[in-house]
Each structure stands twice: as C-alpha cells, then as structure tokens.
From Swiss-Prot:
One of the GO biological process terms: rRNA 5'-end processing
EC number(s) given by UniProt: 3.1.-.-
UniProt-recorded Gene Ontology molecular function terms: nuclease activity
Membrane-spanning residues: none
Classification via SMART domains: YqgFc
Stated name of the protein: Putative pre-16S rRNA nuclease
Originating organism: Fusobacterium nucleatum subsp. nucleatum (strain ATCC 25586 / DSM 15643 / BCRC 10681 / CIP 101130 / JCM 8532 / KCTC 2640 / LMG 13131 / VPI 4355)
Location within or outside the cell: Cytoplasm
Length: 138
C-alpha cells in the first residue's frame, strides 16, 4: 500500500501531512514557506521520499459550499505540481474548517505558550484534510 500526502495550500505557506503506510492515520509532516523554498520541487521530493504519487489537496469553500477565489489559485498550483511530478494523482477534498479546527487544537495544546502556532497550524490543517479523506474512504 502507498502513503498519501496532503497539502493545505496557502499564498504564504503550504502545510504538508502524510499517512501511515496502511493509509489509516494522518500526521503533520512539515510547513513549506513558499517565499523561501521552491515549493513545487520540495513537494516532488516529499512524494519521492515517501514513494507516493497520491496527493490529497484541500479546496477552500465558503460555508454554503461555494468555492472561494482561493480555490482557483489552488487549482493553478495543482497544475504546476502535475507538470513536475510524473503520474501525479490529485484527490480534491473540501477543506472547510480545517484551519479553524487546527487552530483550536493548537490553542488547547499551547496553554503554556510553547508552540509558535503560525509555524505549525498549516501542517496540522493538512493532517485534518488527510484524515478526513482517509476516514471517508473506509
């Protein structure tokens, strides 16, 4: 079985998560700063390191289910990934509330202020997106 990678794609950062080898549990992996790193190449490296071409991508939607303007940017980024990564399989998932849930989890865990939230919220959001997908496919 192959691992899945998930992406929470933003203008500044991309949260990355991966599944366990059985495709049951999602875990935060890293946050890519798009201004400091060639993000498409880094994601290609992550796919290679994890021997996968299965990438779950969160698509931003409004509360009523309509796609937000950001969804168009995410799809443009997906096209860049497809050009870089051979045989890439993209699975789109509604990402409504993933960042809000991640933010709430981190607030609860960070009562002593040890976690710098903005550095981890995106990868936690990516893990929520991936876990949502893994749970749906059971």
């Amino acid at each position: 079985m192959k691992r899945y990678i998930a992406l929470d794609i933003g203008d500044v950062r991309i949260g990355v998560a991966r599944s366990d080898i059985m495709g049951i549990i999602a875990s935060p992996l890293e946050t890519i700063n798009r201004k400091k790193v060639k993000s498409v190449k880094r994601i290609a490296e992550i796919c290679k390191e994890n021997d996968t071409n299965l990438v779950v991508v969160g698509i931003p939607k409004s509360l009523d289910g309509e796609e937000k303007r950001q969804a168009e940017k995410v799809r443009e980024y997906i096209e860049k990934l497809k050009k870089e990564i051979e045989n890439l399989e993209i699975i789109e998932v509604d990402e409504r509330f993933s960042t809000v849930i991640a933010d709430n989890i981190l607030k609860e865990l960070n009562k002593n202020g040890a976690i710098e939230k903005r550095k981890v919220v995106d990868k936690v959001a990516a893990s929520i997106i991936l876990q949502t997908y893994l749970d749906m496919k059971k």
